[in-house]
Amino acid sequence: MSNSSSISHFLLLPLADTRQLQLLHFCLFLAISLAALLGNGLIISAVACGHHLHTPMFFFLLNLALTDLGFICTTVPKAMHNSLWDTRNISYAGCAAQLFFFLFFIGAEYFLLTIMSYDHYVSICKPLHYGTLLGSRACAHMAAAAWASGFLYSLLHTANTFSLPLCHGNALGQFFCEIPHILKLACSHSNLRELGLLAVSACLGLGCFVFIAFSYVQILKTVLRIPSEQGRHKAFSTCLPHLAVVSLFISTGTFVHLKPPSISSPSLDLALSVLYSVVPPVLNPLIYSLRNQELKAAVWRLMTGWPCKCPECGKRFHSSSHLLLHQWIHTEERPFHCPDCGKGFKQNSNLVRHQSIHTGERPYECGNVG
């Protein structure tokens, strides 16, 4: 094959050589993907439905769960398809799309983790300015910037990678499309562009890492000055899930791409690729839900079917808005007021029936006399 224009498809690395192992890998990947969908889906639903979880920390966690869902849906379905149907093919356009979305979600996740470290820094080191620095508009702008940065990062790398002429076949040494394995098929004069891509990734990655490290150094200094042991424990408990997720994300990705060539082997490379591309989206929801009591309680309420419980009478409701309407019974609030006479009502339906007094409407007629 002389160049990339003559390549119609790529050959992905099979997960196993025998049919029995292929089916086993299919079942394993199916279980992993279902666990990731369940865990991240519960976090998204709990944060979206729980009014008390509408805070900057949980807003960014919701975005992180979305990236994890996209992350695992980019690579695992194709691997499952190939294992089930005993094939290795992926089209040229499909490979480009898979690489684009893989880089998009991994870039957005890294930027979101960086922003979440800033959220922890402000909440612990500058609590009096938390509402100003992390208002709803500021949080929306930062989340949008993370997604946009991931998009631009992915677009740059995908366009540069697939603009290279490919001279060394179409077999990839990976179970999904990844830049290093595509570059191995490129012609020799692509080394300079490869170094340029590596430099851009290194600068962005190192910049985010330095920002995260600086944030946690400042957090550690502030926490150590807290006089009470309970206060220090609460501060550490708040940061620990994020720190664990960041450590898992950075350590696995760094080791995969910077491991010594002397210890490299196809089986080890495959295992490490699964570790950094498939495992984190499954573990991230577990890490956050185990350490955060608010999130754990919200997920449990969501799984019960009637997640919102009235603290006064114990009655349960589907949403926090319905619970709020119900609580007016206990507080004697009457939020719906008639514009004509000013009388207050607990429910809007009662207000509508009352207004018929002023309009002269008679919506309910007797079936016998009208």
Q: Which residues are covered by each model-predicted region?
A:
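Transmembrane helical core of 7TM receptor-like proteins
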Residues: 1-305
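Recognition helix and canonical inter-finger linker of tandem C2H2 zinc-finger DNA-binding arrays
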Residues: 306-370
